[in-house]
Amino acid sequence: MTTSRSNALGSDGGRRAAHPILRPNPRIRRLPRACCSALALAFLTVAALADGAGATFPRSDTLLSARLDDANWILPAKTYAGNRYTALTQIDKTNVGALGRAWRTDLADDGEQEASLLVWNGVMYLSTPHDGVLALDAGTGKLIWQAAYNPAYVLLFAVSRGVGLADGKVFIATQDCRVIALDAATGNSLWNVQGCWDTSNSWYSMAAYVYKNQIIVGTGGGDNGNIGLVSAFSTKDGKRLWDWQTIPGPGQPGHETWPGDSWKHGGGAVWSGVAVDQVTDTLFVAPGNPGPDFVATKRMGKNLYTNSLVALDISGARPKIKWYYQLVQNDTHDYDPAMIPVLFDGQVGGRTHPLVAIGDKAGNFVLLDRQSGKVVHRLALSRQVGIDTRPSHDGTEACPNHGGGIEWNGGAYDPNSNSFLVPSTEECASWKITSDDPQYIPGQVYSGGPFPKRQNGTGVLTSIDVDTGKLRWRNALPYPAEGGVLITASGLAFTSDVGGNIYAFDASTGHQYWKDSTGSAVVGPISAYSLNGTQYVAVVVGQAGNQQTPNLPTSEGSRVIAYRLGNAPAVVNDATGQVALAHASNGVGGLSEAPSKSTGSAPYTKQQVTQGSEVYAKECAVCHGANLQGISAPALTGPGFAHSHLNGSQLRVVVTQTMPLTAPGSLKPDEYAAVMAFLLSYDCVQPAGNGQQPFPTTDLPGLQQVELGSATCTVTK
C-alpha cells in the first residue's frame, strides 16, 4: 500500500490552527436521528477566554418588555410569544438588494449549528453544538470570550439551540443534563446543577428559556425511551423549582391512553422550545413522538401527551394542564410537533383573537384559540401520503419523511398583512421495522427499526391568511427549509434553506428581492438587531458532513455571518485558534490540558485495509459516504473530523462500541480491526513495522498519540 498526502484546509484556504484536546469521556451516547454514529462529533472542542464583556445586563422586567426592544434580541425567538418579528425598518424593500456582509466569524465546532443568536447592548451570545458559549462584538464579530464545558458524556450529533440571558449571567443547558450559569463579562462558571432525572436516555438541546427568574428547559431523548421532562430552575443559584412530566403516570389524567407499563418509556421529549403568554402565565409546550417510535402495537391508544400542544398554568408552585390538543394520535412515523409555538393576536371574522400556532413534521399546521384550545384552522402544508399506514417489515412508503414537514424553527406572524409565514420540507421515505416487540435498553435507541434515510428534499415557504385559513402564496426552495422566518415591519420576510441560501421575500406577495449563498447549510434561525444606528441581520451556519441531506452543494465550515446595508468587504474573524482554557467550577466537567500533538503510526496491513474497505462499504458508507465525506452522518476525514479531537484509541472505542447504530457490537472482532485499519489509512496514519503487523482486536496504548483528520490521504490498494 502506498499513500499520498494532501493537507486539509480551513474555509479560507489556510490550515486551521490546532486545538487542545479535552479529557476523553468514558460514556458515549448515540443520537438516533441518523443510521450511523457521528464519530466526528464524539468529543467537545476547547474552551477559550479572552477580554471580558462589559454590557449592563437585562433583568426580568427588561425581558418582560422584550417585544418593545428592537435594538436587541434577548430571547431565542425574540419575545416570549415566540414570534420572530422586528419593528426595525432601515432595511426595506427598496434597499434590501444592497444588503452585504458586515462581518464573518469562523468557528471551530463543525457540528450542526442551530443556535439562536442573542444580542444585548452590542454583544452577541451564542452556543455551539458541543455546548461551547461565545461572546462576540455584535458590530465587528470580534471574539470577546469563549468558554466550553467538558461533559460527563457527549452526544453523537450533538446540538445546542442557544443560551439564555439575565442578571449578568449567560445560561446554557447541556447535553449531559446540566444547567450552567456563566458570568456574562468573563465566561467563567458561576454555578452548575443537575437537570434531567433520567441521565441514561435524556439530554438538553433546547435553548435555556428565562422567564420570571426561572430557567425553563425540556429534555430530548424521546427516541431513546425516556419520559419527557420540563423543569424550571432559579436564575440565582440553579435551585430546582418545579418539574412536569409529559407522560402521565398512574392516577393522572391521560394515563389510561397507555396500556400496561408502556408509559414508562413513552417518550414525549420537549427538545425544541417553548413560549409563554405573559398575561395569563401560560406555558406552551409541544411534547414529541411516543416510544417505541415505529411500533404502535407496543402502546395502543392515544399516547397522551405525545404529539400534542399543551397549555400549562405556571402561576402556582406546580404546572397544571389548562388544555391540550393532539396533532397525531398513536404516532408511528416520528412526526413530532417540533415547531416552537407562536403566540399572537390575529384577525379572524372581523375580530381580534388570541391565537397560538403549532406545526409538526407530518406537515400539519394548526391555529388555535390560545385561551380555550379550540381549533381555528388546520391545514396540511406538506404532501401527505401513507402517514396513517404503519411501518412494516417489508417497508412502507410515506410522505413526508421524519425530517420533512414543519421543523422546529417554524414560522412567524406578520401583523401588517394578518398572515402567517412558515417554511416546510417536501421529502418522502420508506419505514421498515425490524421487530414487532422491541425491547427497551437504557442508553440505546428504542424505535423498532432504523430511521429512514434522508432524501433529496426541497423546501416551500407558505403564506397563510389568518382570517380564512387559505393560502396566499407559496414559494418553492431548492433545498429543505428548516431555519424559520424573520419578518420585519418594513414588509420583508427573511428565510433560508439547508443548501446554504438566505432569502429576502416580500412578506405580502412572496416576491424575491435578495439572496445570498453562505457556503454552508443554514439550519439555525435568523436574528435582527440595531447597533449605533445600523440594522443588522445575522445567522450562524454550518453542518458537519452535510448530514441533513445528501445533495448539498458545499460545506465551507461553521461561521456566524452578519449583514447590513452596503457592499464593503466584510470583516473576517477567526474564532478557531488555540486559546487559554476557561475556568470551570463546582467540580463537574473540569477542563484538562491537551497531550502533545502527534500524528504517529499504528500497526495494520494492506489486507486489513482491503477487508476494512469492504466492511465499511457495507455497514458505514450509506451514512458516512463512500469517500468518508459524510452524508447523513458527518465526515470521517478532513478538518471537521480533525476538530472532533478523536485520537486513535478513542476512535477505536467509538467504532467498536457504537457501530453499527442499529446493532452495536454485531461485527466480528477481525471486522472491527479491519475497519480501524481502513480509517487509519484514509486519515494518513502510517503503517508500523513496514505494514507487516496487523491491527489487533484489543486496544493499543500507542493509539492515544495518533492524531486523526488533519490530513486526507489517497489509499492505493
Which residues does each PLM region occupy?
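Short coil/turn segments that connect the beta-strands within blades of beta-propeller domains
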Residues: D70-A71, N121-G122, D167-G168, K212-N213, ...
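Short loop/turn segments that connect beta-strands within beta-propeller blades
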Residues: D137-T140, D183-T186, T235-D237, I314-A317, ...
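Beta-propeller blade signature
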Residues: G228-K239, K302-G316, G459-D465, E556-G566
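Gly/Gly-Pro-rich "capping" loops immediately C-terminal to redox-active cysteine motifs
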Residues: K606-S613, G625-P660
